Amino acid sequence: MVKAVAVLTGSEGVQGTVFFAQEGEGPTTITGSLSGLKPGLHGFHVHALGDTTNGCMSTGPHFNPAGKEHGAPEDGNRHAGDLGNVTVGEDGTVNFTVTDSQIPLTGLNSVVGRAVVVHADSDDLGKGGHELSKTTGNAGGRLACGVIGLQA
């Protein structure tokens, strides 16, 4: 089993920890907890770069090795890093588990060394009709991010 972790920090007290685990060539399971967010849906993505020199803005676009459009996690036409939304409770926190087969921890398209980002707004999953729907899901600003690193 390969494991990885990202510690998210950001503006306005938003923070969290996200764990990744993959058995062999199987799907990757992502479990995490976030706090300091406004209640509701927030876009959650793996971005292409693990560069946080300019905060979350330098993490680049969504991880998209196949050159597809933005979409929902269950869509065939989606960025590999499109993980949909997390639903934040009234207390500003969320605990979540996601399983995805497009974000491996090993191999050519490994997400290790890339960044995970939580956004200010909900991800419209590429279906909102906004000019940004097919690139970012119109998910708004980047509130917190962390670089995905291997874990013992």
Swiss-Prot record:
Keyword entries, A-Z: Antioxidant, Copper, Cytoplasm, Disulfide bond, Metal-binding, Oxidoreductase, Zinc
Residues reported in the UniProt entry to bind Cu cation: H45, H47, H62, H119
SUPFAM superfamilies linked to this entry: Cu,Zn superoxide dismutase-like
EC numbers on record: 1.15.1.1
Source domain of life: Eukaryota
Annotated positions binding Zn(2+): H62, H70, H79, D82
Segments traversing the membrane: none
Cofactor mode of binding and number, as noted: Binds 1 copper ion per subunit.
The protein's name: Superoxide dismutase [Cu-Zn]
Source organism: Zantedeschia aethiopica (White calla lily)
Upper classification of the organism: Eukaryota, Viridiplantae, Streptophyta, Embryophyta, Tracheophyta
Name of encoding gene: SODCC
